[in-house]
Amino acid sequence: MSVGTVSRVVNGHPSVTEAKKRIVNEVIAELGFQPDVAAQSLRRGTNRTLGVVIPDLRNPFFADLMQHIELRAKERGYSVLFASSDEQVDSEADLIASLARSKVEGVVVVPSNRASSLANPEGVRLVVVDRRIAGHPFVAADHRAGARMAAEYLVSLGHRRIACISGPENAFVARERLAGFMDVMAPRLAEAGLDPASWIVSAPFNYEGGREAAKVLLADDGPKPTAIFACSDQQAIGVLRVAFDRRIAIPGELSVVGFDGILVSDLVVPRVTTAVQPVASIARCATDLLIGGEALDASASHIFPCAMALRETCAPPR
């Protein structure tokens, strides 16, 4: 077996067959071999480290994403540096440049909601997650199809007065999810003589955003929705809190669907029905793209389908 084949196995290259991997790994275990990380870094001009820049450390979805990126990176023999831009475009650019100067092999970036481009003066390899930025490969869930699926599920239960808590208007994922909701609901609301715009409230993706939007949608005056599609699980949990405070039974009087599939959505009572993003697949794909070595342009993008997790917050309307 050639030195090159052994090197590819040690460095986690995907081109080696499973049979050869097994033989090399058995010999490595028998000899107690440990690769010289310093020598590898010197040869490659990098330090087998990846960077990750996210916009908000408080968002549970991003925490989950970081965990899965780190797991995949470790499987490939890499460590990870994490940083948060706090939704600041200037900070985002500074962090990417700083990570590049640290000789990371690439950076996974979840851009801030206001970002329309990514500054990359150091020329580091970039993969964008969860948003779409022109000229860069992106890895994301199919937000629009996931929202359509959520709205169609509520319609299948018999709901017609379905409201939507959208996200910030400048957020790519908010626009995509709202578009998916409107694909299903715009004609149905119009048929019912309801103005679609009056059944949509934009709010931050967090718990408080969901609470404040729910207060508007569940106000005492005018017709009320029998169901609410919240464009994030955090918003959906905020709706549950308002319903609890107002003694609105869920799902008896109001059905609620979220989006993301964060852990806490399966822990609250009642457990939230939600459109689940395949975060492990997204993280794995983004990490492998960075490490893979192929050209990184928009053609390398990947979109993953969402799946509905049917739990305890939905029922047919009374």
Please name every model-derived segment:
Residues 160-161, 194-199, 226, 250-255:
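Short acidic capping loops at alpha-helix termini that bridge into adjacent secondary structure
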